């Protein structure tokens, strides 16, 4: 059985975070569209999506020659990441934690 990737590994790349953010907000997108929206090269986007797919965070669907990607919401980790991203994006003011902003 493959080893589960650590949270640090999944979130260690700003490119992967951008991809997760786009997919959390939009849903399913074509690889080229993800690359364009995240301002990354096609090859870098493909590599990040492959890593996220191997971690079962993202799932790929092929429609002929078109490769579409979306979050794998069957995976509890992907659900948690999506919830975190949506909460983070919707938060307009920093919350006070132990007297610190």
Regions found by a protein language model. Give the residues of each.
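Amphipathic alpha-helical dimerization/coiled-coil segments
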Residues: 1-4, 73-101
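A short acidic, leucine-rich amphipathic alpha-helix
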Residues: 33-36
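Short capping segments at the starts of secondary-structure elements
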Residues: 14, 26-30
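Key DNA-contact positions within bacterial/archaeal DNA-binding proteins
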Residues: 43
